[in-house]
Amino acid sequence: MRRRTCLQTILAGACAAAAPAASPQRPIQLHVDLSVDAAQEKQMLHNFHTVFRPAASKQPGFIDVKMLKLRSALAGAAPAGANYRFELTFASEEQRQAWVATSVHQQVWPAIEKTLASKNYTILLYDEA
C-alpha cells in the first residue's frame, strides 16, 4: 500500500512540474515621442518633475515614469520633430487606463501637453517580454 501511495505522490509531483506555470502578468510601457517647444522646455521639465511624476507615482500599478531628451540618432532616423521621449511603466494596461481616466490625470497631462510644438505625437504601447 505504501508503494502505491509513493508512486501516486511521485506521479502527481511530476504532473504538476510538467504543467505550465501560470505566468504572472508582465508590466507594460507606454512610449510617447514628443516635440517640445524649445521656449517651453524648462516649463515642461518643471511640470513633469513637480506635477506629473508625483501624481502618477501615487497610482495603483505605477512602476516608473521617465522623460528622456534625445541626444542623437546612432542608427536610422529619429522620430520626425521629436526631441523628447516620455516613458511610462505600469504593472498592467488596465491600471494605466484607470490612471488616464482619473480627474488627476486630466489635470496633470495638459501641463505637459501645453508645452508641445505639436500634439501629433506617436504613442507606442509595449509589453515587457
PLM feature segments, named:
Residues 1, 18-30, 39-43:
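C-terminal segment of N-terminal export signals and the immediately downstream linker at the start
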Residues 69-71, 125-129:
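A general secondary-structure junction signal
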Residues 27-35, 67-102:
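Short, well-ordered beta-strand segments in beta-rich or mixed alpha/beta enzyme
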Residues 5-22:
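N-terminal export signals
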Residues 46-50:
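A non-catalytic, amphipathic alpha-helix used as a structural packing/dimerization or gating element
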Residues 7-11, 51, 55-63, 81, ...:
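An amphipathic, aromatic/His-enriched active-site/gating alpha helix that lines ligand/cofactor pockets
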